[in-house]
Amino acid sequence: MPKMKTNKSVSARFKLTASGQLKRTRPGKRHKLSKKSSQEKRNLSKQPLVDKGQVGMYKRMMLV
């Protein structure tokens, strides 16, 4: 049986924390930032955790 392949799009978008949770980045902070307020850009910088219901699916895709 061949090796399992990691889903590269998922592994690029999510980072695994030491406790096993997944961090994600918020969309909307790549371009057109001049229209956004400082507060909005600051809030987009925060990296929330992925919801519990989807963590298992993403971990399987990352082969963790």
Swiss-Prot record:
Region Disordered: start-end pairs: 1-55
Recorded GO CC terms: cytosolic large ribosomal subunit
Keyword Ribonucleoprotein in annotation: yes
Stretches with biased composition (Basic residues): 23-35
One GO term of the biological process aspect: translation
Single GO MF annotation: structural constituent of ribosome
Keyword hit for Ribonucleoprotein: yes
Keywords, ordered alphabetically: Ribonucleoprotein, Ribosomal protein
Family: Belongs to the bacterial ribosomal protein bL35 family.
Protein name, per record: Large ribosomal subunit protein bL35
Species assigned in the record: Chlamydia pneumoniae (Chlamydophila pneumoniae)
